[in-house]
């Protein structure tokens, strides 16, 4: 018997079940170069593989929005150009050309600091895997063949792997790679499947069909458990399921503290599917819609109409509140179709609202789309990375311009739409009392705020322990912002990781926070803490 401790808990739960090894065929690209007279044939092989993958993704996209982004990537002209140029110029065979181009694309995402964006590298590799399988003429594994309950164990799992997950049969998931913001983690949470990711070397320690015990909440895997350990985990599982049922029973109870304060529980999302996944939690709305993913998963700056379609659907789903953060790129978030100048310190450079105010036509396309969507639900506009009153006023002025343009077109929108801002820099904290007179609401972004206040790169493992939003300097900043907002009568929310941290709930309630916005998987636990608050 061996006990393995794991750091990355993607989805809580306890399982005692046998393992199903979900292993891919060998997709290692063939080596060697090609002759000049083979170039056209290799390009045609790629075209056939691409067309087959695009057709398959198109069918999947009709069932699940996640694959709409895959479809955009598969159709990306830069991907096609990258593969074809390697075949023509480097005389790479088609397998090598696909592999190298996919690696380059994936590295763009993998090098990003933001965990959610870092995980999008897996989406790119998913497309590469599909193309390679077509070229090699091999079949990929299929969870649809399962006939009995198992814990699925894999090197990694991509969105296409998750399509056929049946929660009645897939009782747990363990992967050697991946992070807590990967698609498999997000889908596992939405389906209530216990999941552990980033478990290095696990495939070499377990045999197919072997029973294991798994506590995804505590981050523990027991390999080759004895009878006594199995019974212990079965008892823990029964107790856990009873607790989950109790928490789910609280979902229809509004988050009101025992002293009568109504707290708003919202979800952070990156797309419409995320909203659907969060709705069963009985959320009070969406506290953060990351609009940048519409841009990053595209092959061009999305048009007003393309954005409107998405925002409209989101507004209809999150009818109580949909807070759309305007484009937040720069820093570690790049666009495949727009070349950013190299900067010494991109996190301190041209990013977020600075880009939007410099690229006014692009910004107004987004603002008009948001305004039009506001006719279909309670939509709020939130500006990121504001550090000066001039930025906030200029952004609001552009909204007013867009309103006039929509009036001229005769298109409906909420004439009283709320316009707020992220508080995520020391400057915005120090000027919070002034901003509160101009903004309709605040949302504290503790991820960047903590990084900037403490001068700590949260992606740097050497100083990761210093990244701590419980640091008194950060707590004082949060207190100052909440007090400034309340003095002017505006709502103050939080959409950073701290909002979903159970250890932080009591403190944030003490400070007077009005709205907690977090990943859907944390909402049940935070709700209970709020209800028990004296």
Task: List the predicted regions and their residue ranges.
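Non-catalytic, soluble scaffold/interaction modules
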Residues: 1-317, 322-329, 359, 367, ...
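Conserved alpha/beta-domain cores
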Residues: 244-534
């Amino acid at each position: 018997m061996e006990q393995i401790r794991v750091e990355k808990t993607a989805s809580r739960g306890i399982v005692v079940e046998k393992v199903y090894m979900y292993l891919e065929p060998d997709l290692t690209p063939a080596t060697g170069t090609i002759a000049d007279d083979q170039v056209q044939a290799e390009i045609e092989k790629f075209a056939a593989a691409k067309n087959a993958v695009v057709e398959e993704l198109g069918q999947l996209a009709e069932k699940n929005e996640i694959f709409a982004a895959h479809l955009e990537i598969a159709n990306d002209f830069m991907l096609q150009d990258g593969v074809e140029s390697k075949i023509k110029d480097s005389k790479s065979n088609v397998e090598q050309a696909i592999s190298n181009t996919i690696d380059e694309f994936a590295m763009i995402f993998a090098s990003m600091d933001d965990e959610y964006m870092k995980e999008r590298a897996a989406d790119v590799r998913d497309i590469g895997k599909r193309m390679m399988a077509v070229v090699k003429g091999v079949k990929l594994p299929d969870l649809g063949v399962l006939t009995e309950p198992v814990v699925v164990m894999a090197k990694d799992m991509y969105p296409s792997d998750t399509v056929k997950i049946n929660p009645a049969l897939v009782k747990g998931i363990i992967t050697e790679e991946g992070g807590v913001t990967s698609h498999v983690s997000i889908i596992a949470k939405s389906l209530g499947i216990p999941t552990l990711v980033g478990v290095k070397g696990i495939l070499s320690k377990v045999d197919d069909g072997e029973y294991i015990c798994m506590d995804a909440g505590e981050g523990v895997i027991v390999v080759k458990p004895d009878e006594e350990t199995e019974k212990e985990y079965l008892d823990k599982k029964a107790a856990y399921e009873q607790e989950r049922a109790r928490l789910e029973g609280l979902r229809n109870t509004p988050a009101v503290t025992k002293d009568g304060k109504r707290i708003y529980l919202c979800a952070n999302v990156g797309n419409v599917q995320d909203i659907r996944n969060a709705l069963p939690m009985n959320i009070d709305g969406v506290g953060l819609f990351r609009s940048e993913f519409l841009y990053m998963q595209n092959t061009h700056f999305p048009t007003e109409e393309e954005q409107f379609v998405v925002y409209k659907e989101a507004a209809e789903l999150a009818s109580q509140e949909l807070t759309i953060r305007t484009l937040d790129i720069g820093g570690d978030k790049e666009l495949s179709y727009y070349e950013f100048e190299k900067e010494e310190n991109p996190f301190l450079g041209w990013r977020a609202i600075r880009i939007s105010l410099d690229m006014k036509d692009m910004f107004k396309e987004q603002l008009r789309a948001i305004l039009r969507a506001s006719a279909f639900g309670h939509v709020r506009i939130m500006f990121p990375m504001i550090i000066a009153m001039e930025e906030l006023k200029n952004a609001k002025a552009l909204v007013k311009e867009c309103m006039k343009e929509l009036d001229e077109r005769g298109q409906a929108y909420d004439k009283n739409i709320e316009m707020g801002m992220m508080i995520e820099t020391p400057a915005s904290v120090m000027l919070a009392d002034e901003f509160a007179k101009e903004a309709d609401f605040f949302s504290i972004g503790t991820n960047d705020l903590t990084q900037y206040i403490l001068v700590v790169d949260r992606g740097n493992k050497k100083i990761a322990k210093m990244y701590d939003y419980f640091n008194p300097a950060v707590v004082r900043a949060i207190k100052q912002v909440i007090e400034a907002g309340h003095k002017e009568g505006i709502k103050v929310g939080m959409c950073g990781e701290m909002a979903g941290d159970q250890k932080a709930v009591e403190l944030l309630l003490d400070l007077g926070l009005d709205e907690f916005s977090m990943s859907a998987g944390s909402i049940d636990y935070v709700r209970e803490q709020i209800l028990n608050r004296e």
